[in-house]
Amino acid sequence: MWIVKGILSSVVLKGHYSLFSRPPPSSLPDYALRFLHFTCCRSSKIMFSEFDSSNASISPELRQENAKALDSCYTEEQRAVILQRLNTATESELEQVKLLRGRKSVNIVKYRTRHGPFSSLESVINVPLLKYKSAIMVFDSILNPDNKRKRNKGKVHLAKFIKPDVNRAHLEDASSIISIVCGTNKIAWAHMDRARTVLDWQQAECQSFMKGTYLASDYLEDISSVISSFPAADFFLVEKPSISPQNTSLFPVMVHLRTVEAMLFALLSQAREPGSPPKVLNMMRISVGRHFDLMVGDCRTSGAETLRKMMTDSVMKRDPRVLFPHDLVLKHRNSFQMSSRNKGEEMCDALLQAVAFFELLQE
């Protein structure tokens, strides 16, 4: 059944009268015929009684109006600034623009290489993952790079990615953090500084996890052993899992993760003076997934491919997104292949969480 937008002013008769045929004057009043607009097949070519919907007089007008929509939102000078940035910036420079981190910056560079420089703002939405609304935000960010930072100075909104609430200035002053991710049988952590240089990166097996009756003393012994190797850092960032309590099949896993999370907070938190920020923070797992475009619906996919690219860029590029020491690249270069996914998934997530923390603070 066709979904018809608008009202057909003519009367459709059964028999030999077609949809666009005028009935005899004696039978019905003289109504003006109007074109049908089909919302589900606007770009397709459909014929009705010698009427070509793809070449109708209204379609080119609509296409022309849409083609001018983005470009007409900006002055000639603003369009020149935006196109200059998009046509000349490197991948790492594009990642500094809001919404262009990860795959979007890669797609822009690939599109330029294949099709040449962008000739109009409208052509930008041909890039995969960039649609009308996101393109507007990208353009505004290029024209006003400091606006958002000035507006959001103060506290980071709880709903975004950090809990508990912390003054943004304290987070921005952090010289290094330790990102911690817990799995069903191991704990992984990454030590990273403000320049996104990986200082250390490890994981440890925990023999008591998900065993028997979840004996608290065994959990405490394993977790204490892991954190005893942590270096000094300004903040400890613990991943907040996104398992729903309604998913009863994963209830044992959720209890395990919450138990480890509570012990990490207790063991890593120190007595602090009134007004000083907490040192142990939660970071939403979903926020990290959205930052790296790893979400499929409500589920987060593996970030192994993203991490492998970061490690490669650290060796090949002069200004990489993340700087890995040479010994860590050699040590972990084969840890994130498909055949060893379960071996290094927690390490992968810990590293990505640290990168997302510093990059989100720059927005």
UniProtKB/Swiss-Prot annotation:
Name its GO BP terms in alphabetical order. Answer: mitochondrial transcription; positive regulation of mitochondrial transcription; transcription elongation by mitochondrial RNA polymerase
The answer to whether the entry has keyword Transcription is: yes
Residue stretch of the organelle transit peptide = 1-23
Identify the GO cellular component terms for this protein: mitochondrial matrix; mitochondrial nucleoid; ribonucleoprotein complex
Q: Which GO terms describe its molecular function?
A: DNA polymerase processivity factor activity; nucleic acid binding; transcription elongation factor activity
Sorted alphabetically, the keyword list is: Mitochondrion, Mitochondrion nucleoid, Transcription, Transcription regulation, Transit peptide
Describe what happens without this gene: Morphants show reduced movement and have abnormal neuromuscular junction morphology compared to wild-type animals.
Where's it found, cell-wise? Mitochondrion matrix; Mitochondrion matrix, Mitochondrion nucleoid
Matching entries from InterPro entries are given as: RNaseH_sf (IPR036397), RuvA_2-like (IPR010994), TEFM (IPR039150)
Instruction: Give one Pfam hit by family name.
Output: HHH_3
Q: Report the function annotation for this chain.
A: Transcription elongation factor which increases mitochondrial RNA polymerase processivity. Regulates transcription of the mitochondrial genome, including genes important for the oxidative phosphorylation machinery.
Q: What's the family?
A: Belongs to the TEFM family.
Q: What name does this protein carry? A: Transcription elongation factor, mitochondrial
Q: Please spell out the taxonomic lineage of the organism that makes this protein.
A: Eukaryota, Metazoa, Chordata, Craniata, Vertebrata
